[in-house]
């Protein structure tokens, strides 16, 4: 039980850290937060090996400049809302089963996947990473996925002890985090398959973030002259920016 509580607390802390900067940025305490948190970001930026962690890989204060990037931004909101809604539905199902003492939740999404609540939180985490796109958030998301896997394993051990008549058979017919057919195809049930799946997920997350940053940078409507670089908040203001910047630079 202590191990379960530790894993659960770790997952909660990771999700809280991911959400924290977003919540504070829309609050009146943004200045205070950055005065306290800025040394951490500066510490990361101090060394070439960790500098990338504090940087952004997608627009967050600017309107995305093209339809593809706008679609990515919208999908961030969709994934976050969808993940949280599915999580709440799954949580309601689990607690209803406990309240009415009907045994483990085996219907709905649980009839295909044993831990849809963790999968839905991971999906919501992808949405959060798009809405507040620091590389550090991506690394925290990868860590969170690993903690969810440990939670799922610990939960299954406890459920097999509590429901030895139904849960072992349930495990044979369902997947842990993906439909059983998918997990069988990637050999997820083996230790090597799990390790390979985690490495692939981590590589896709970090590599995808770098690719998105490269694409975003190459499509930003940048105005530059000498050592001055400017960006319009709204892409439609690029013409005004080009027209006015020459006059602005003449102001003493």
Each language-model region and where it sits:
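Membrane-anchoring alpha-helices and their flanking helix-loop junctions
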Residues: 1-106, 119-246, 250-252
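Alpha-helical architecture
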Residues: 81, 112-113
